[in-house]
Structures are given as C-alpha cells and as structure tokens.
Amino acid sequence: MYILISNDDGYQAEGILKLAERLGTVARVTVMAPERDRSGASNSLTLEDPIRVHPIEPDRFRVQGTPTDCVHLALTGLLEEDPDMVFSGINAGANLGDDVLYSGTVAAAMEGRYLGLPAVAISLAGTWAPVHYDTAARVAVKLLEQIQDDPLPPDSILNVNVPDLPWDEIQGFHATRLGCRHRAEPVIKQHDPRGRTIYWVGPPGSEQDAGPGTDFYAVRNGFVSVTPIQVDLTRHAGLEQVRGWLDGVTW
C-alpha cells in the first residue's frame, strides 16, 4: 500500500515524523506537509499566490501552503504515482466535536476524500503539549492493518482521537459521533508595545454535548475515538421544513 501523509503542524512536527516512521514500517509513504504550523487553516486553498514545493529527501516535501494545498498538489499531478489513501496527523492536540470545522488536520483528510481516496485524520488528545505520539502512531498502524484486511470505501473519512496515554493504558477503540462545545470564550484584547490594540482568538468553549457515544466521552475514558465524517453538510432532516418556509416567500 502507498500512503500520502500530511498534517497542519508543519513538516518538522514530532507527530508527522513519528507517523511516517511507524507507517513506513508497513507501507510505502510520501510526506507532503506545510513548511510551518498552519493549525486552524481548515479547508483553505492558496489561489492568489504561487505555491513552492521544496524536496527535502526522497518522498518528503515541505510546501509553502496550507494542509489542503499539500494534498491537492500531491493528488493532482505532483506525484508520479497515485497513493492508495491519505493519513493526516498526528495532530498536537485533540480534534473533537466542533474542532473539525477549523482543523487543518481534518481538512487534509477531507481533501483526500474530495479527490477520491479514503482518508484518516489522527490527533493526540491531551494538553497543549501532548507527549505520547508513539501511542497514536501505533494506533495508526492498527487501523491501517484493519483497512488492508477490510478496505474502506473511497468516500470514507475517519476522524481519530487518541488519548495522550502510554500504549498499555489505552482501553481500546470506540466508534463515536462528534460531540459539540459551548460557544467559544471571549476574544482576548491586549496592546502592543506601541499602544495599539491587538486581539487574540479566545479558547474554545467547554464541552456541551459530551455524553456516552461522543468522541469527547470516549477519549475522556481512555478509548480511541473513531468517528466517520462526511463532506455533505446538508441537513437532510430540515429540507421539508425549508421547502414549506420558502412557500411563504413572495416572488
């Protein structure tokens, strides 16, 4: 199997280095990752500027672009051979619930799905400085082995969150749904050395929907959460209501 690996923390991040090392023992891998941290880039593509790609060594590239740029370039002509699937990560921190809307890690996996490949986004869910990357990398290998035995459909995206624990403390796997958070904390207002006002995006909101069955709950209890996600954002259950509502619009 041939795997494309990307991330949003940058090509030198510990997570992607460990992921490539572990997956490289069981598959052929190519790493194409941003040259710097692009956390929170979501699905953004670079459209107004050229994108420079710098080979570092065979099958390893740093890209002056977003995580989505990396996967898009790789799968639309930069690589001579098409990979079989995409792995994105290992992210330094969780991508639980609403986090997936902003995550460059998840976006890289989504771009793989857009371009016809099954994809896995994997994150190490702990503090702002997680340490057990080898645990998450071993989880990735386990998932790849299962995929090889029982392949995923091409439209599959798995969002995987691994507790920041030693391998022998992981309780197993749970298939989960996305939970959600409360509204984000207020923006942080400060002043620069010249007295000008500057702003920082505040912390994410606390857990709201985080009960049994959610990704939050699984990780909190020591399980690896595996959430199938999709790119169709249509709220199908609301279509009839909107049709009826539109009947009241005068033309």
UniProtKB/Swiss-Prot annotation:
Its cofactor is a divalent metal cation. A divalent metal cation binds at D8, D9, S39, N91. It holds the Pfam family SurE. Its EC number is 3.1.3.5. It catalyses: a ribonucleoside 5'-phosphate + H2O = a ribonucleoside + phosphate. Belongs to the SurE nucleotidase family. This is 5'-nucleotidase SurE. It comes from Halorhodospira halophila (strain DSM 244 / SL1) (Ectothiorhodospira halophila (strain DSM 244 / SL1)). The lineage of its organism: Bacteria, Pseudomonadati, Pseudomonadota, Gammaproteobacteria, Chromatiales.
